Amino acid sequence: MTALSPCTLNATQELSLAYSMRLGMPQLALGGLSEAWLLMECGHRHWTLLERMLGVEARCMYDDRGCRMYASFVAVHESGASLAHFQEADEIVLESRIAALTSKRVLSSHFITGRGRVRIDMISAFVRKARPSDTDTEVLHGAEWDRPGIRPLCPLAEIDSSLPALDRQIRRGLDGDYMGLSLQPSGLSPAFVCRPCPAIDFNGVGLLYFARYIDFVDRAEWECMLAADGSRLATVERRIFYFANLSPGDSVKVELAGGPGSLGRMEHLSRISRVSDGRQMALVYTRKQCTRA
């Protein structure tokens, strides 16, 4: 990077990353591999590969109006082995690749291999703020960042991922159940409300960090559904669909449908919304498994 000009990247670099590492406490949680760390790491790798794809550093991405462009996640799917399969001092390999879905959306896939194998797919779209202080953003079209120095997105004919179809299904609207779960008021747990902390939950541009959404879901699960024996649950699958952000000082409300099942399983569908205006911020489907008998 030091040999390159401040705002351009080497166009000959491969649009993939791979490295191995040894797991320590920063990468682990009580139930195995830390899901929060994993999302943050894969998110960072997504943005790194996106810079290579467009040929420009993220801090230098501006649209045709001169507004800063941000790669905002719209959907994330985590699947594969339980995170409980990963333990301290394990050697893992993390492989990532990226491809354009459309002229305005990008998909990255990340494979974490150790005692088990986990896959995380992530879709992002470019957004901008009307003013730097805004938290609501608007999605940009390809022509709006068609500027010298930024390479256009060239969609692939075939994508090896189920996430685009899952995302389209959600954005058509939930008229009934999803994965056998319904968010009708009669089936919801008591609402969990909390106020995100600016020093912990927001990123450097003032937006609620994408990886924090599941923190609120897990806190709601812990407060509303679990007894002490729920501390050994580990995630097996997570689907996150993002719709909106919020301002520092605002609060979030989490509503859950579902709950503990047989054989140590947990499955629920959650809706995250803003307390200030009731706007839906995200829908999250979660499936977990107890790590002990």
Mark where each language-model region is.
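Hydrophobic, proline/glycine-rich low-complexity stretches
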Residues: 1-93, 101, 217-221, 225, ...
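Non-catalytic linker/capping segments at the edges of enzyme domains
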Residues: 1-37, 104, 129-205, 265-267
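Intrinsically disordered, low-complexity regions enriched in small/polar residues
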Residues: 21, 72-75, 128, 180, ...
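Generic alpha-helix signal with a bias toward terminal, lower-confidence helices
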Residues: 50, 54, 131-138, 214, ...
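Bulky hydrophobic/aromatic packing residues
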Residues: 62-64, 126, 143, 214
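HotDog/MaoC-like acyl-thioester-processing domains
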Residues: 81-166, 246-248, 258-293
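Acidic/His-leaning functional-site neighborhoods
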Residues: 177-255, 261-269, 280
